[in-house]
């Protein structure tokens, strides 16, 4: 679960290393974000020469959460960290590579470009 002020690891090669969630998109009373939700975030840590700079406000989609969640088949899944991929206005990733596994729920949310770039889909 991701909420305001949550820090997330960035799982792509845009140059950002860590972002801080400003808002979970999807309505005025949405408190928590789950895998597949889009957030507005601020870049807190970035590498020099990257596509995004520190302090930049970006949109990102959550690809991993440390809090376990249930699936319709009755199984549960959780990851070691909270991670997101920075996306543009067209919901396509701004980076060209994705690091680490991503959740299968992204397929249902129509983030097919992220699914195709990911090394592993769990």
Curated annotation (Swiss-Prot):
<dbReference type="GO" id="GO:0003735">
    <property type="term" value="F:structural constituent of ribosome"/>
</dbReference>
<comment type="function">
    <text>Binds to 23S rRNA. Forms part of two intersubunit bridges in the 70S ribosome.</text>
</comment>
<dbReference type="InterPro" id="IPR005745">
    <property type="entry name" value="Ribosomal_uL14_bac-type"/>
</dbReference>
<comment type="similarity">
    <text>Belongs to the universal ribosomal protein uL14 family.</text>
</comment>
<protein>
    <recommendedName>
        <fullName>Large ribosomal subunit protein uL14</fullName>
    </recommendedName>
</protein>
<keyword id="KW-0689">Ribosomal protein</keyword>
<keyword id="KW-0699">rRNA-binding</keyword>
<comment type="subunit">
    <text>Part of the 50S ribosomal subunit. Forms a cluster with proteins L3 and L19. In the 70S ribosome, L14 and L19 interact and together make contacts with the 16S rRNA in bridges B5 and B8.</text>
</comment>
<dbReference type="InterPro" id="IPR019972">
    <property type="entry name" value="Ribosomal_uL14_CS"/>
</dbReference>
<dbReference type="InterPro" id="IPR000218">
    <property type="entry name" value="Ribosomal_uL14"/>
</dbReference>
<dbReference type="GO" id="GO:0070180">
    <property type="term" value="F:large ribosomal subunit rRNA binding"/>
</dbReference>
<dbReference type="GO" id="GO:0022625">
    <property type="term" value="C:cytosolic large ribosomal subunit"/>
</dbReference>
<dbReference type="InterPro" id="IPR036853">
    <property type="entry name" value="Ribosomal_uL14_sf"/>
</dbReference>
<keyword id="KW-0687">Ribonucleoprotein</keyword>
<dbReference type="GO" id="GO:0006412">
    <property type="term" value="P:translation"/>
</dbReference>
<dbReference type="Pfam" id="PF00238">
    <property type="entry name" value="Ribosomal_L14"/>
</dbReference>
<keyword id="KW-0694">RNA-binding</keyword>
